[in-house]
Amino acid sequence: MGIDRILFMPDTFQIGRTVMSDLARDGLLEAELCVLDMPITASYEDTIRAAELMEAMGAGCCVVLGGDGTSRAAAKGLDETPILPVSTGTNNVYPTLTEGTVAGMAAAAAAILGPSENCRIRDKRIEISINGRFADIALVDAVITADLWVGAKAIWDTGKLRRVIATRCHPSSIGFSSVAGCVGVVRDTDDFGVDAVLGDTGERVLAPVAAGVLSTVSISHIERMPLD
């Protein structure tokens, strides 16, 4: 389809080098294949750094394999390069289950056609600040909880949830964004997000807040959030 170079992120399982070896043996591709020359730490920081390098090297599209967290890490390292997020597991909201050949064709089209064609969107994200200083981003949702302990950052007690802010939401999306999604659907192409305030009173919804977990939550107030 006209792609002349394909970059791989290095990883501890040597996935990129295995793919390169198999393709070279079979003679299936004419494109140049290479693994990024960068140290790895076996953490999400590798994904951020790889995304930064790919954008600096002029990548036209980044195919991200993984879940919501992997896509979020890649997004932290990119400014203008589009992401094609491919889900490699279940209960993901941001990446989608896509057949590999179709994903490759879409990535090639996005890289070749560029921003002038209607083949990409400027996605939404939530920017989180602490005491007025930028701290992090979220691609799908950010939650305010009354829980005092950070731990592994997994929240299981929905009774301590106070707010759910989401860029997109649907009742079938596993996670806290489904709480707002039970009231109304917000798509990735909509020019707004949603802010749901939770409490002891208000509309009660039964939401799939985690894989295999349904919780009843009361929404005292919900409103659209315009893009900034």
Language model features with spans:
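Glycine-rich nucleotide phosphate-binding loop and flanking beta-alpha elements
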Residues: 14, 69-70, 150
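Residues that line or immediately flank small-molecule/substrate-binding pockets and catalytic motifs
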Residues: 10, 66, 146
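Short, solvent-exposed amphipathic alpha-helical segments in soluble enzyme
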Residues: 23-25, 78-80, 143-144, 159
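ATP/pyrophosphate-binding catalytic subdomain of soluble kinases
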Residues: 118-228
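Active-site histidine-anchored catalytic micro-motif
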Residues: 34, 38-125, 129, 133-138
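Short, glycine/acidic-enriched capping/hinge loops at junctions between secondary-structure elements
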Residues: 17-21, 96, 154-155
